[in-house]
Amino acid sequence: AIETGDLETGRKYINMIRERAKNTQHVKTMDQSQDAANYKVGVYDEPFKSKNEAVQALRMERRLEMAHEGIRFFDLVRWGVADEVINAYIAKEKVFRSHLQNAHFVKGKHEYFPIPQSMIDICGTEEMKHNPGY
């Protein structure tokens, strides 16, 4: 809805997710005897002021809702912000993680995965070419 400009419907859908997330009856301890979460999740009471504000709210909600699902990278690539977000993360984390000292995300290359050479060998180089940057 947000991408088509219907910010109010987008806000409604985001708030539905937030209402469900803060409902602790869905998050119980293993024996189901007590709440396992103490979320402080609020809804968006005011209409979004702009499409950009709505998009940012949607992206944050998706980040929270889909945490640990293994799809964040693909969201960042689809939204065209992978280089910005990943390089900001690397810049912050390399202070604490020595293996990130020379790491960087290369826009136009790292959005893609290399095609296994075995597949290129099977198909032939005329039919199948490597992704850009590989």
Q: Where on the chain are the PLM-derived regions?
A:
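Acidic/polar-rich alpha-helix caps and helix-coil junctions
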Residues: 1-134
